[in-house]
Amino acid sequence: AVNIEIEFISSSELRYEFSVNKKLEPNTKEVISSKFIVPTLPISQPYWLEEKANFGTYNVNDQELIGVPENPPAITFKARLKFEEDVIEISFPLVHKKNDPVKGELYRPFIIAPKITANVDQPIYLFSSLAPQKVIIKLASNTDQQKGVLELKAPEGWSLVYDKEFTLEKKHQELKVTATITASKEAKEGLLEVFINGEKTRGLNTINYAHIPTQVWFPDSETKLVFVDIKKKGKKIAYLLGAGDVVPESLRNIGYDIDILDESDLGQDNLVKYDAILLGMRFLNINERADFIMPKLLKYCENGGNLIVQYNTAH
């Protein structure tokens, strides 16, 4: 048998080196424990999202990263192994592992996150009157004992009322802050930006599917405020959902009453109360029951109703 000895483990990102000098026994799991202080490191933002995208193009400062499918590991370790008289070094990333009772061992990249994230509930708010609207900001703590001052910065012509001070005592604790926003006639279109303790804050978005590693990114905490002078006709709209669009929320923001319907709601006695029916984005492409739904909607049109079909693709 070949004698194998692990001499030390190190990490340049952590500025850490741990001397082991221990012989490894054949077919025996060796657990090595050590404590270290993690220095301040950049958050785990996908490299192509570090700068704001511009109409589908991305700005990447480090040209060597272009084409790489994912970020290099946030933290890597090196271990020096001695085989008799030969010495080799192996590198391996720090990863998070958990045991699932059904799927077995699951791995995901080690993520460095901000201490606090702030997610605004909608990407855009439309105002068609001077009536106030509620904007919800969800604060989440990634470590214990976090408190601070929340600040919302809006363009000229907008007034905001909200609680500024907050406390998050435990890791993963969440707090929803409701801000009341009112537009004036001089309100300018622009971004509502979220600051915590004077610093621009980031949100947290997660993509989690079984067939790919979990993906996270940290967009700027902000939403768009738009004041438009709209002359509305009608009040009540029926909406049949399409491919993940957010049109219903935007219509509600400008004062329409929106009901989300499915096929069981399409009786003529029910549809007659609506001023219009709106089909969601690519509804005709993705809804397998569209061939059976459309005759009911066209009958509604024959009876004097208004049907609006949004974007669809041709096959």
Report the location of each language-model feature.
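Long beta-sheet-rich domains in secretory-pathway and surface-associated proteins
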Residues: 1-226, 231-232
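Helical hinge/lid and interdomain linker segments adjacent to catalytic or ligand-binding clefts
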Residues: 236-315
